[in-house]
Amino acid sequence: MFIGSNEAQATLIQLLVERVLKELDSTPLNVAPYTVGLDSRIEELMSCLDVRSNGIRVLGLHGVGGVGKTTLAKALCNKLVGSFKCLVFMENDRENSETDDDLVYLQNKLINHISPHKPSVFEVNSGISAIKEVVHEKRVLVIMDDIHNVRQLEVLIGRRDWFSEGSRIIITTRNRDVLPDHLVNGFYEVRELAFTEALQLFSFHALRREKPTERFMNLSKQMVSLTGGLPLALEVFGSFLFERWRIEEWKDALQKLRRIRPHNLQDVLKISYDGLDVQEQQIFLDIACLFIKMEIKREDILDALKGFGFRAEIAVTILRARSLIKVFEDNSLWMHDQIRDMGRQIVLDESPVNPGKRSRLWDRDEIMTVLKAKKVRPIVRYLISSSFFSCSFSVALQVQNFSKRQI
């Protein structure tokens, strides 16, 4: 094929870019292979969005952690593939996203999704102008997952009139109060599963069947009642019991549930952590504290952990079987933020006041404070902060004894 001018070449390149982006937009997002009650909720949301109508709708999905907001948003996104010129699922991979640097990072991420040829911005106001420009060009679906504060919405979504007619914006959050009425014109509370739905989900993960056998039915019902209707708790606790066929083991697990605070998600998750061996626990804590939110591949984590003398392959397989981590089709590793928070709380409890006495540090301010003071006990194993690095994978610094080093 002969291209006769620079203008023609530029046009062809633009067409190719648009074709590639359309293919990427049509790639389904990873959703749990087994879900319960999802279809009826999607139908309710489709009615709320009314995608065939003009106008701009902003829908806020709110609910407690672990209730399935992200899963629902991803499934809805997959349902709407092909209905918009551009489809964006924005994961909030900056844990606080309150500093200008974090907000600019998220702005660039959104801009790049919609218009990859646009140059990067370097300050918030420029980002706002760039976002207004790109979202006004085409009918888009934007899903903002796990929004923590109003400021994030102000610099990423702003106002409805920024967007082209027919656009839809979906926001997920644990906190209903971060959804301002002047921006959001539809609200949907994601509620816990009904008891029959919860029993079905628990049974799948514990027994790989839709309904418990008579032998396990009574124990299963008691466990579901104590666990509550949170899909995350049901999945993790059910996976904890998978391939445990002795009634005595189930009764022991039931007693553990009875000893924790009623329907407390973190306590339920920790039962699964307590069931790991020592090395598996260490690897779980490494992943929770150091590698999550870094867009990291499974092989990279395995290489890093093997470098520290761990039999990482077996441990990662066990963590995956327990539903404590997930490995997606692109081989990226993912951990639910509630599970991550449980792991980090274990490390924080090692020394609530003095971060230098903890086994792992991940907060950049705490890292700098400890390094400046040059006071780290020998058991501090790793320091890492993804905010310090611009690359997708950062190397953990293994610490032997800072008292013997000049930092």
Where are these regions (language model features)?
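Surface-exposed helical/coil interface segments that assemble multiprotein signaling complexes
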Residues: 161-163, 213, 240-283, 288-407
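Leucine-rich repeat
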Residues: 55, 83, 136-139, 165-166, ...
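Hydrophobic residues in beta-strands of the RecA-like P-loop NTPase core, especially within AAA+ ATPase
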Residues: 142-144
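Hydrophobic residues at beta-strand termini and immediately following loops
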Residues: 90, 188-190, 383
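N-terminal flanking helix/linker immediately upstream of nucleotide/cofactor-binding cores
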Residues: 2-67, 71-86, 91-93, 102, ...
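Conserved catalytic network of the ASCE P-loop NTPase/AAA+ motor domain
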Residues: 51, 81-82, 133-137, 160-165, ...
